[in-house]
Each structure stands twice: as structure tokens, then as C-alpha cells.
Amino acid sequence: MWGFAGGRLFGIFSAPVLVAVVCCAQSVNDPGNMSFVKETVDKLLKGYDIRLRPDFGGPPVCVGMNIDIASIDMVSEVNMDYTLTMYFQQYWRDKRLAYSGIPLNLTLDNRVADQLWVPDTYFLNDKKSFVHGVTVKNRMIRLHPDGTVLYGLRITTTAACMMDLRRYPLDEQNCTLEIESYGYTTDDIEFYWRGGDKAVTGVERIELPQFSIVEHRLVSRNVVFATGAYPRLSLSFRLKRNIGYFILQTYMPSILITILSWVSFWINYDASAARVALGITTVLTMTTINTHLRETLPKIPYVKAIDMYLMGCFVFVFLALLEYAFVNYIFFGRGPQRQKKLAEKTAKAKNDRSKSEINRVDAHGNILLAPMDVHNEMNEVAGSVGDTRNSAISFDNSGIQYRKQSMPKEGHGRYMGDRSIPHKKTHLRRRSSQLKIKIPDLTDVNAIDRWSRIVFPFTFSLFNLVYWLYYVN
């Protein structure tokens, strides 16, 4: 009886002790126990040699990488580069950092990264990079129970991007980000995209003012240098330039200025001030557009697509100015000179012919001009005018007589009158030639302007058709 009661009494008093012991044991292994976590971290870092890679002397460390792109801030044609902000994450396994008793991942302070081995990753085509430091340095260390380490950084990098601008601004560019190990060869480290094609995210969120991202590709390969073979990962973007900005800022103004230069074809040929001022203004405007465009592009040795177009527009504008110079030369220069030579040649021929007509004198000493002679001379004068406003010249077919003044019919006086007959007739013909020289031929001038109104627009339209078909396709 007493034995049974004593056992019950022992059980009653020993139960709280067992519960306390179990609770104490659980509290030691509780992840929320800061002292236990501290002891675990201290144990991991105690004796850890940062100078040696994981599995030193064994197989290479496999480092997986993920990139979450925050933004592409700028693509510069002048500097041949682009600026990228991203969350860069690296995964690898370090058995020295495996732990037990805590079934949770340990996210540690960013300063712990200075006490652990991390891959010597760098960006091959980097020009300038930095890790953000507001409010603290933007890097993260996370440990998994099996020893897997996550090392994350928020980085902004300006990477080189060699561009082919031959088709600018109707071009597509391919910009890459090259990731490589600086010191470890493939015997010590291997890189791979963690997650395959989904290793890079955030591309669909990117919006650029002048480009659209057509696609992105991931490449993994090894490159060989004199010091060995090194792992390399490549992220490439195919960027297609948006043409809308250039249509409004470059192409449309150039087209309108070229069309404006053709207005001179409808301005009267004798309005020299208006036509010259219009031609010079359009030429200078095209020069200004071309100069402004070149300031935004690098000094490259080859011709770009937009250079071809602006040069074509400049040629059309310059030819429109030269067209008036040619018209002006025809009207005031070559035309009178040509007609002067023609008149002198005609006058000489008629002078020779007049010598054979000295004897065409009637009984009273009058010079007889046949109606056909008068008709021919008046037609030459009227033909030289070429304008209906200046060609209203009429004549009488009944014949014209040039009567000499009454002279004494002595022998000496008659001899002097006969000798003056050819001189007076030559003077009449010379006056006709001078009239032809003073009035230039307007037919050629008007024809040049009329043809220019057709040829210039047609040729410019053909130029645009060939240009856009070639560069767009």
C-alpha cells in the first residue's frame, strides 16, 4: 500500500522536473535562441580560411548566377556604352559553412561578406561600376543549412557597347554584359546561369526613350588566354531604335526645307533678290541641321544612313540655287553674248550682200528695198523679242523706199550721193541688230523653270523611294 502510494508521489514530484529538462533542451535548439545562433555563427567562422576556395584541391566550385534588371538608364552613341542597374546574385556551396540544429536560413549582416570566400567575378566590358551604398552598402549574405551561400549585390555598371552606325537611325544594336572570373580558371571555378533561360528577369519592364528591346540571349562558354581557360557568361540585348523621334526632328524638317527651295521656280526670273535669298537660306538651314546632328554622334570614318539622306537633301537645295544661277546666266550673260555674235555674223553677211545691191537704184536715185527684205528683217527683230508683249511689230508689204535728199545734179554731187547709199543701208541694218541684242531670248529661261518644277520633285520622290526601301528592309 505504502509502495504504491510512494510511487504515485514520486511521479507527481518528478513530472515537473522532466518537463523543465525537456524545455531546457528544446530552448537550446530553438532557432529563436540568440545565444545558440550566435554560437553557430561563431563556430562557422572560427578557423575559416578566406584565402582558400571551397573544396580546395577537389572539383571546381560551381557558381550559379541570377540577374534582376532594375533599369537601363542610358544608351550613348557618342561614348559607345550603356548604363545598367541590376540586382546581381551568385550562388555556390561551401561545405565549411554547413550547419545543423537551425532549420532556417541565416541572413547575415553585409559586413560578414568580408570574412567569407566569394568568387572573384568581374565585368569584362565594364567602364565604371559601383555598389550602391544608401543607406548601407547594398549587399547581402545568406547561408543555407547545407552550406549554400547566396551573395547579392545592387550594382550600377556602365558597360562598353560597340555599335555599327551605318544604318543609323534605322539600325539595331547588340549590347552585351560579359561576366568572367578574374583569377580562377576552369580548374577551380565554373559559372552557369541558375534557372536556364529564366536566370535574367525584369527585361519586360524596361522602357527606353529611343530603343525597344527585341530580345535577350544568355550564353555560357569558356575563353582561353595565355594564363589558362576562364569561365564566361554573356547577357546580350538586341536593341531596335525607335524612328519616331528622328522623323519629327530630322527627316520632316529636311523634306520641308527641300520643298521650300523649289518655290524659287515659281518666282519671276528677274526677282534676283527673292530667289537668291530663298536659296541661300535653305542651304544654310540644311547645313545647320547637319552640323547639329553630327554633334550628337561619334566621329566615325564611315557614312551613316542619315548622312546619306541629309546630303541628298542638301544637294537638291544647292541645285535649286544653282538653277537660278544658270537662269540668270542665260538671261543676262550667255544669251546677249550669243545673240551679239549671231547679229554680227548676220550683219556681216548682209553687208556683203548689200554690196551687190548698190545698183538697185531707180532713175531718181532712190534705194529700193523689196518687201521680202523688209519682212525678213522685221521677223528677225520680232523673233529676238520672243514675248507677245514686245512683238507687236507690223509692216507694209507695199515696199519701202529710202529717198535721198535733193542734190544738185552735177557730176560731183551725184557721185557723193551714190557713194552714201551703201552706208545708209548698212546703218539701218546695224540698228536692227542692236535692237536684237538689247532684248534677250526669254524662251530658254521660262523652259528651264518649267522643267525644274517637274524634274526636281520627281527626282526627290525617287530618291526617297530608293532610300526607304533600302534601309527599312
UniProtKB/Swiss-Prot annotation:
Its main location: membrane. CDD domains: LGIC_ECD_GABAAR_B, LGIC_TM_GABAAR_beta. Histamine binds at Y122, S181, Y182, T227. Keywords: Cell membrane, Chloride, Chloride channel, Cytoplasmic vesicle, Disulfide bond, Glycoprotein, Ion channel, Ion transport, Ligand-gated ion channel, Membrane, Postsynaptic cell membrane, Receptor, Signal, Synapse, Transmembrane, Transmembrane helix, Transport. It is a multi-pass membrane protein. Glycans are attached at N33, N105, N174. InterPro entries: GABAA/Glycine_rcpt, GABAAb_rcpt, Neur_chan_lig-bd, Neur_chan_lig-bd_sf, Neur_channel, Neuro-gated_channel_TM_sf, Neuro_actylchol_rec, Neurotrans-gated_channel_TM. GO terms for biological process: brain development; cellular response to histamine; cellular response to zinc ion; cerebellum development; chloride transmembrane transport; circadian sleep/wake cycle, REM sleep; cochlea development; exploration behavior. This is Gamma-aminobutyric acid receptor subunit beta-3. It comes from Rattus norvegicus.
